[in-house]
């Protein structure tokens, strides 16, 4: 089965006649903030289970240019949704493969892939903010303005001050995890994306599909970004340590607009931790979900080069670990 596309190129302006419907649509965003592999997806799934939020999904990300049209023409919208579901089934796509998180047309997806940064880090900025605001309003119009809009893009973890300025009413839920575990998990994740073609990522990332059309580039990428690559290791360590320090230094600038939880607490005490989150957001879910169903922490040895450099990593992130009350991983 062919890969589904949002719409033929010449039809991507189908929403234009309906944009006036967004004039009075407001958004009240809640940003989940944290590094990749810090637990942002698990936290988002727990929050979405309360039925108090809308969010970006695979469906509304792929069809973002015609979302209003498909909503106002339900038969066509249902056909597009079925096309996407059939694609998942034909590829036997049940999870994202690298972390076991389930996928499907209505599964939550990070908004970063809608920002059009063409291979660069998908950061929300002044250039792409208007287009993103339009997408956010479309989602609220289609899915219901009585819910808050939950947004997640770990690439923005080192740029949340801009988000706070761009969205003056936004609130932030930070999730923190041991930097050592984050680094180890990120290396495994990014290396796996080049080890074999990931059909799920093909739907979202144009350059990823183009890369696998050129086998020599794949081989080169596997060498540079392999699980045992010193380059990938140092690149990730640099990114993680810088982001941890940014969060440590600037988190308090958000004041009462933000709260913090740890991945360790979410795994050990999911109900109590999520009650803190819903209380902070002034939410009263009609029922309390079984949050534990989304949590499946894995224990595995650190990669050899991460283990060898453990002391250096812990020294570089010690103030962050202390600031947010994180526990050190046992050797």
Where do the PLM segments sit?
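Conserved phosphate-donor/acceptor-positioning beta-strand/loop module used by diverse small-molecule
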Residues: 152-154, 163-188, 277
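The Walker A (P-loop) glycine that initiates the GxxxxGKT/S ATP-binding motif of P-loop NTPases
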Residues: 33-34, 152
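Short catalytic-loop micro-motif centered on adjacent basic/acidic residues
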Residues: 148-152, 260-262
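A conserved segment at the C-terminal end of the G1
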Residues: 41-54
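ATP-binding Walker
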Residues: 37-38
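PAPS-dependent sulfotransferases, especially Golgi type II membrane carbohydrate sulfotransferases
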Residues: 1-24, 30, 187, 191-331
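PAPS-dependent sulfation machinery
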Residues: 59-150, 211-212, 221
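Short hydrophobic/aromatic-enriched beta-strand-loop microsegments
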Residues: 54-56, 170-178, 195, 285-286
């Amino acid at each position: 089965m062919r890969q589904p596309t949002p719409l033929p190129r010449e039809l991507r302006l189908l929403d234009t006649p309906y944009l006036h419907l967004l004039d009075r649509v407001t958004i009240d965003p809640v940003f989940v903030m944290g590094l990749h592999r810090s637990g942002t997806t698990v936290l988002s799934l727990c929050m979405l289970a309360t039925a108090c939020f809308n969010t970006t999904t695979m469906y509304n990300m792929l069809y973002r240019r015609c979302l209003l049209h498909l909503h106002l023409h339900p038969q066509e919208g249902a056909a597009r949704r079925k096309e996407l579901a059939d694609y998942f089934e034909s590829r036997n796509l049940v999870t994202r493969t690298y972390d076991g998180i389930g996928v499907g047309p209505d599964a939550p997806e990070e908004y970063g892939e809608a920002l059009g940064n063409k291979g660069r880090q998908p950061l929300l900025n002044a250039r792409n903010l208007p287009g993103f605001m339009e997408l956010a309003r479309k989602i609220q119009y289609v899915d219901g303005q009585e819910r808050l809009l939950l947004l997640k893009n770990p690439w923005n973890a080192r740029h949340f001050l801009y988000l706070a300025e761009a969205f003056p009413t936004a609130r932030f839920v930070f999730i923190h995890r041991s930097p050592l575990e984050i680094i180890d998990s990120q290396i495994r994740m990014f290396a796996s994306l080049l080890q074999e073609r990931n059909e799920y990522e093909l739907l979202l990332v144009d350059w990823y599909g183009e890369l696998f059309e050129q086998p020599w580039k794949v081989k080169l990428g596997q060498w540079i970004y392999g699980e045992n690559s010193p380059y990938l290791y140092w690149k990730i360590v640099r990114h993680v340590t810088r982001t941890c320090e940014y969060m440590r230094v600037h988190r308090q600038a958000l004041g009462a607009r933000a709260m913090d939880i740890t991945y360790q607490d979410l795994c050990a005490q999911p109900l109590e931790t999520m009650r803190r989150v819903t209380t902070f957001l002034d939410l009263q879910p009609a029922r309390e979900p079984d949050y534990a169903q989304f949590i499946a922490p894995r224990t595995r040895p650190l990669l050899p080069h991460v283990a060898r450099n453990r002391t250096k990593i812990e020294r570089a992130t010690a103030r962050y670990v202390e600031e947010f009350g994180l526990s050190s991983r046992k050797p």
